[in-house]
Each structure stands twice: as structure tokens, then as C-alpha cells.
Design a protein with these regions (language model features):
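Sec-dependent N-terminal signal peptides
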Residues: 1-20
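Scaffold/interface architecture of coatomer-like assemblies
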Residues: 19-333
Length: 333
């Protein structure tokens, strides 16, 4: 290399800022910029991934949220009670602190409509479709609530994903045609895991699933209790409407009762066709007349275990409280 070339190389290496730029950390934010978070994503993890992760629900390390319904001894909803009228018991211990308590009559809804489209419901399927469409038209508010439609026989089928467009939802309901066997538990599991959990929440939201079925299941890969667990993880209240028209409660009706009871919902048994519409109307009214409480549990452990919830009314003689039976604690990161 000649002297002129060496001199040119030395000049270029000594230019201000060259060495500093090469050594500067790529993650250093500019003054006033918001640094990139190093925390894990807050989106629910993919429950289908075999990584042992626990799907998130509305539970923080120091706060639990639960929605509940109160009725009097005649079954009429009670909507004017105060925080002092209740005690929250978490895993057999009173809550350390009540963070908030109020009547929730106007929270946005995420509603999943699960319709049994197996051969066993063929006789009254058309009427149930029209009742479901009327419910969606009356309940879903444009720009505020969202709903989806899933039909199931041997497998679940999403005929309309989450939308606030009631016309599209109605079309999704009318697309369903009865036929085939019944995989009820798989459908509930799928709706909670693959739809509700993956959708997440943009803010305070109430989740509800309305399940129309006779409660019979002959094809599912998951069990009833696994389906219930996934609904609890998704923080979904499940309302069940029986399509059994025999006039007596069978084994399927007991399944529907179990699912509703475990998630804080309610089971309806409309033995006459016109009662299906009444059941939908009851659900619509209840979704707008519930209570919401956030509290700090005692001796909380972020270990992924199931913790029981009991909302106790001070006047137990006259009031009945209906809430989900518990929740799965998140796992500490």
C-alpha cells in the first residue's frame, strides 16, 4: 500500500461519530421515546401449544374480578344492593380488600352463540334459529357489543366470527343445517380456547356463551369437566337452553345444569317451543342487570391452581347469589 492510500484510510477512520455509531446499543431509545417493553406479550397464549402455559383470565396477581347475579326467593333479579350486603370468600378465606363494587348494566358484551346442529334437534331447529336471531337483534349494540355464531354436530363450525353486525350474525344462524352426531364438549372447549381467549379484551368486557343443545354428547375428544375448565379459564358465563322436548329431565339436561352452574350461568328447560324465546329474553335481561366486584384475595399464590369463589349475601334467607365457582390463578412469570 502506498503512503497516499494509508493517509486516506487514517483520515476516514478518524471521522467523528464513526466509532461511536458502531458501538451504540441498538435498544437505546431516543430522548423522550418510549422504550420497547421486555415483558411477555399480554395476548392470551395459544392453548393448543404444548408448552404447559395457562391461558389468562381477568385475574391479576393482586386482583380478581367476578360478575354475579342476585335473585330473591321468588327468582326475581335484585339490582339495588350495596357492597355492604355481600362478603367475598376466596379459597375459603374472606377477601383482604374490595377494590371496586358496582352494578354492571352497560359493559360491552362478547357473546358466543353455540347451536347444536345434530340430528337430535331437527324437529324444532327452525324455530330455535329464529329465536336466536331475535335475541341477537335485541342484544347486540352496533359499535359496542360483539357476537359470534358456532354450529356443531360432529365438529364445531364458525358460520360468523365476532362482529357487531346483526344482519351478518343472522345470516350465520340461518346457514346452519341439522345433521350428524354431537360433540358438545369439543364445541364449548373450542369456543372458549380458540375464540374467546385468542380474541382477548380491549377493556372491561362481559363474556357470555349461550348454548342450545339437548346436552347429549357422543363424539367429543375432551371431557365435560375439561370443557368447563376452559370456560372458567376464558372467564365466560355459560347459559344453556335445553332442546329436549320429552317433558322430563334426562341425562343431557343434567349436563346442561352442571355447565351453567360451574360458570355462574343459568340452565333453561323450555318444554314448549314458545318458551325458547322467553329463555332468550331472560338471558338478555340478566346480562344487563348483574353486579361486578374486584377484590384482593388472601394468601394468593400465582401457581396455576384452581381457587374457589363464593359471594355470600348478608341476607341469605331472601337472596340467592349466582356466580362462577372459581378461577385458575395465573402462573408467575
Amino acid at each position: 500500500m502506498n503512503l497516499a492510500a494509508v493517509a486516506l484510510l487514517l483520515v476516514s477512520l478518524c471521522k467523528p461519530g464513526v466509532a461511536q455509531s458502531a458501538a451504540a446499543p441498538a435498544t437505546s431509545p431516543a430522548p423522550g421515546a418510549t422504550p420497547q417493553s421486555t415483558q411477555p406479550s399480554q395476548d392470551p397464549p395459544d392453548p393448543s401449544a404444548d408448552n404447559g402455559s395457562v391461558p389468562r383470565i381477568r385475574v391479576g396477581i393482586n386482583e380478581v374480578n367476578v360478575v354475579f347475579t342476585v335473585t330473591d326467593k321468588h327468582g326475581k333479579r335484585v339490582t339495588d344492593l350495596k357492597q355492604a350486603d355481600f362478603q367475598v370468600v376466596d379459597d375459603s378465606k374472606p377477601a383482604v380488600e374490595i377494590r371496586s363494587f358496582h352494578s354492571e348494566t352497560n359493559l360491552p358484551l362478547q357473546v358466543g352463540l353455540l347451536i347444536d346442529a345434530s340430528n337430535s334437534v331437527r324437529d324444532r331447529f327452525k324455530f330455535e334459529q329464529e329465536s336466536a336471531i331475535e335475541f341477537l337483534n335485541q342484544t347486540i349494540r352496533r359499535g359496542y357489543d360483539q357476537a359470534m355464531v358456532i354450529g356443531f354436530d360432529a365438529t364445531p363450525e364458525v358460520t360468523q366470527d365476532f362482529t357487531d353486525n346483526t344482519e351478518a350474525l343472522g345470516h350465520g344462524v340461518r346457514e346452519l343445517r341439522p345433521g350428524g352426531g354431537t360433540a358438545l364438549y369439543d364445541a364449548l372447549y373450542y369456543a372458549c380456547r380458540d375464540k374467546l381467549l385468542k380474541k382477548g379484551r380491549a377493556g372491561p368486557t362481559r363474556r357470555a356463551i349461550i348454548l342450545l343443545s339437548d346436552g347429549e354428547d357422543n363424539l367429543s375428544h375432551v371431557t365435560r369437566e375439561e370443557a368447563i375448565e376452559m370456560a372458567q379459564r376464558a372467564d365466560a358465563i355459560v347459559y344453556t337452553i335445553s332442546t329436549n322436548v320429552s317433558g322430563t329431565k334426562g341425562a343431557g339436561d343434567k349436563v346442561l345444569e352442571r355447565i351453567a352452574d360451574a360458570t355462574g350461568g343459568r340452565a333453561f328447560f323450555p318444554f314448549q317451543i314458545r318458551d325458547v324465546t322467553n329463555a332468550f329474553a331472560e338471558i338478555q335481561d340478566e346480562l344487563r342487570s348483574q353486579y361486578d366486584v374486584s377484590y384482593k384475595p388472601a394468601d394468593f399464590k400465582a401457581d396455576g391452581h384452581f381457587r374457589t369463589i363464593e359471594i355470600v349475601a348478608s341476607d341469605r334467607k331472601n337472596y340467592r347469589v349466582r356466580a362462577r365457582r372459581g378461577y385458575y390463578a395465573p402462573v408467575a412469570q
